[in-house]
């Protein structure tokens, strides 16, 4: 009797187990998740651009996860929210920045999303800009940002961006 009851219990549990997701179901779920993530991420980005324009470093830094890693062109990786906040404050202190980012794609699966996009930026040096820094320069580039949803909020946990600007040609000796 005990064996029979155990066998019936195992069969009942197996019958109640969720069916594996089909490829089509997964694609539909991920499309819906990606669409929702894109809408949310674009809203976060719009807020971040307002904070950036206003020089509000503290509000801007909150959009980064505590363990964020940011990799910018020609610079060491920035690790952690406090380091990112310090870098933002440093950069904003150099002068006036104007930036527009355009999201071109978001792929999401559960609490993770990857955003691809491009940016256009303009900089005008202020009195606290380091010696030798260009007084003004426009820039265009692209980025890939990894997002993690934490307690309902999308936070950046990895960001890599790079410029489309060409590296200046080195002076040739004797020419």
Write out the residue ranges for each language-model feature.
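Bacterial N-terminal signal peptides that target proteins for export
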Residues: 1-6
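Short, low-complexity N-terminal intrinsically disordered segments enriched in polar/charged residues
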Residues: 16-66, 168-175
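Short beta-strand edge/turn micro-motifs at domain boundaries
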Residues: 17-21, 139-167
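Hydrophobic pocket/interface hotspot
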Residues: 48, 60-61, 68, 80, ...
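A short gly/proline-enriched turn/hairpin at secondary-structure junctions
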Residues: 63, 69-79, 90-94
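A mature extracytoplasmic/lumenal domain signature
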Residues: 64, 74, 110, 117-121, ...
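Surface-exposed, charged secondary-structure patches
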Residues: 85-133
């Amino acid at each position: 009797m005990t064996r029979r009851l155990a066998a019936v219990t195992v069969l009942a549990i197996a019958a109640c187990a969720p069916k594996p997701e089909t490829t089509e179901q997964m694609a539909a779920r991920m499309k819906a998740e990606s669409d929702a993530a894109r809408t949310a991420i674009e809203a976060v980005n719009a807020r971040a651009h307002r904070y950036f324009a206003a020089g509000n470093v503290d509000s801007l830094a909150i959009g980064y996860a505590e363990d964020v890693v940011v990799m910018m062109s020609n610079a060491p990786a920035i690790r952690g929210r406090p380091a990112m906040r310090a870098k933002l404050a440093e950069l904003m202190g150099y002068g006036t920045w104007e930036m527009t980012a355009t999201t071109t794609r978001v792929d999401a699966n559960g609490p993770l999303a990857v955003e691809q996009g491009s940016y256009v930026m303009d900089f005008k040096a202020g009195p606290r800009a380091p010696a030798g820094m260009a007084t003004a320069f426009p820039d265009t580039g692209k980025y890939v940002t990894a997002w993690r949803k934490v307690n309902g909020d999308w936070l950046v946990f990895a960001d890599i961006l790079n410029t489309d600007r060409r590296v200046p040609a080195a002076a040739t000796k004797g020419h």
